[in-house]
């Protein structure tokens, strides 16, 4: 367990609690497909980085109630380990193509987190464009269109948001808090479950 990983039991309790109180968890794609009045009882559930543990742990928990989520993946890391993450204390695998296809077929949205999980604030304009455009093209061709993006490390500014807006309708940051679609759609906040 680390500061961005939710323990399995905590996640299970959260999902059970939401269900018992008439709330549902869903992907951003599913949420946007609903009439606005129906959205009040739904929460968009997101996972960054696309670790394989989602397949073995989160999928069964959410599937129990027919819930789904959006998982943000880096396209060059699909099926590989997390050597890129020197802050992670253990070696973890990213979801592979078969696992991502299963999630997609179960109603999960597969969305972009860039190509390599680079800090966008440190990239040149050409590198930034590549990360945003290439990941969009790959995700859309493999799993169908996605309008969502999550900034690696939450790293963004007005210029990065403008670049992302050329390809996506919504972008998630790592800022804590609730949000609405009438807010800044390229700086959507989220709550961590802990």
What are these regions (language model features)?
Residues 24, 109, 169-170:
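Conserved beta-strand segments of alpha/beta enzyme cores
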Residues 52-54:
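Glycine-rich anion/phosphate-binding loops
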Residues 13-21, 61-66, 106:
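A short, Lys/Arg-enriched amphipathic alpha-helix followed by its capping loop at the start of a domain
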Residues 1-2, 40-43, 63-157, 181-189:
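Metal-dependent polysaccharide deacetylase catalytic core of the NodB/CE4 family, i.e.
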Residues 92-93, 168-177:
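Acidic, His- and aromatic-enriched active-site or binding-groove loops in soluble protein domains
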């Amino acid at each position: 367990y680390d500061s961005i990983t939710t323990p399995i039991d905590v996640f299970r309790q959260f999902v059970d609690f939401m269900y018992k109180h008439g709330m549902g968890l869903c992907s951003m794609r599913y949420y946007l497909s609903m009439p606005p009045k129906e959205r009040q009882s739904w929460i968009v559930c997101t996972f960054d980085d696309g670790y394989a543990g989602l397949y073995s742990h989160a999928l069964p928990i959410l599937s129990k109630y027919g819930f789904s989520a959006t998982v943000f993946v880096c396209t060059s890391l699909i099926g590989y380990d997390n050597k890129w993450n020197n802050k992670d204390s253990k070696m973890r695998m990213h979801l592979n193509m078969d696992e991502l296809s299963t999630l997609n077929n179960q109603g999960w949205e597969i969305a972009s987190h860039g190509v390599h999980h680079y800090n966008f604030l440190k990239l040149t304009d050409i590198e930034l464009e590549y990360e945003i455009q290439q990941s969009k093209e790959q995700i859309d061709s493999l799993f169908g269109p996605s309008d969502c993006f999550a900034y690696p490390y939450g790293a963004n500014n007005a210029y990065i948001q403008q670049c992302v807006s050329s390809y996506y309708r919504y972008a998630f940051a790592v800022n804590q808090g609730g949000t609405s679609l009438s807010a800044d759609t390229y700086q959507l906040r989220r709550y961590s479950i802990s």
